[in-house]
């Protein structure tokens, strides 16, 4: 499974990259605008920072077919390996996905609100499909829709990977990971919640207190004895 960060905050990525195995970064127009930086600066920072094996996902902004292709080619040209252009599943988007795949570009179909939308993008050859899990829940059973999509892809032998996005809580993430999802992309706050169970802190504090009481120090080795 691929574990990806959904953010344009490079410092947040660096911090989590030291703690966990991070497979890449996703961005979108809204996330980039919240960075307070120019888009060219944000993209350049990540192109320079990410390791070759880490994936980078950047979304087109234009809704015009020809301009979508132009933006997609520009994005992939900045970092030819392991860069994927994100294309919303509009009518022009489906057309662009089909064309870009014929040119050999990596494509993630995004802004997906139903299993049917995702399935059609998979038929066009999209490498990744990004269902907006929590937003789908606002219209019905979002988790169930993703389960349906997993079955649809398997039944018809399609190789697109599901990169689940738009999570509100860790319960949604847990449900999809447990079901065998291909990939998730998460904002840093959700990631920290996943690793921050209060019971862990209590247990560590109890271990430390017992050790200090018995040995009068906070380390395994008694350095003064060397």
Regions found by a protein language model. Give the residues of each.
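Alpha-helix-loop-beta-strand connector modules within alpha/beta enzyme cores
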Residues: 40, 44-56, 78, 94-106, ...
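C-terminal alpha-helical cap/extension of soluble enzyme domains
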Residues: 153-226
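Catalytic cores of alpha/beta
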Residues: 11-19, 67-71, 75, 96, ...
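Glycine-rich phosphate-binding active-site loops on the catalytic face of alpha/beta enzymes
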Residues: 29-32, 111, 128-139, 180-200
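Active-site beta->alpha loop and helix N-cap motifs at the rims of alpha/beta catalytic domains
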Residues: 2-14, 19-22, 26-99, 133
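Active-site-adjacent beta->alpha loops and helix N-cap segments on the catalytic face
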Residues: 34-45, 64-70, 87-102, 114-122, ...
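Conserved, mostly hydrophobic/aromatic
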Residues: 28, 85, 121, 176, ...
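Glycine-enriched alpha-helix->loop->beta-strand junction motifs that scaffold or abut catalytic
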Residues: 20-24, 79-81, 99-108, 123-130, ...
């Amino acid at each position: 499974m691929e574990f990806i960060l959904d953010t344009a905050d490079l410092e947040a990525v660096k911090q989590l990259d030291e703690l966990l195995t991070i497979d890449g970064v996703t961005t979108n127009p809204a996330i980039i605008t919240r960075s307070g930086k120019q888009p060219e600066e944000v993209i350049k920072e990540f192109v320079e920072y990410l390791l070759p094996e880490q994936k980078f996902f950047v979304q087109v902004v234009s809704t015009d077919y020809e301009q979508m292709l132009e933006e997609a080619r520009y994005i992939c040209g900045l970092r030819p390996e392991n860069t994927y252009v994100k294309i919303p599943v509009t009518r022009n988007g489906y057309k662009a996905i089909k064309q870009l795949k014929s040119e050999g570009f990596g494509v993630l179909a995004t802004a997906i609100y139903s299993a049917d939308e995702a399935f059609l993008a998979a038929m066009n050859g999209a490498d990744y499909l990004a269902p907006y899990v929590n937003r789908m829940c606002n219209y019905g059973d979002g988790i169930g829709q993703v389960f349906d999509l997993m079955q649809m892809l398997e039944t018809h032998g399609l190789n697109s990977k599901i990169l689940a996005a738009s999570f509100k809580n860790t319960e949604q993430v847990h449900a999809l990971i447990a079901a065998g999802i291909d990939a998730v992309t998460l904002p840093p706050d959700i990631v920290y919640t996943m690793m921050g169970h209060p019971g862990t802190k209590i247990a560590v504090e109890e271990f430390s207190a017992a050790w200090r009481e018995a040995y009068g120090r906070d380390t395994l080795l008694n350095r003064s004895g060397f």
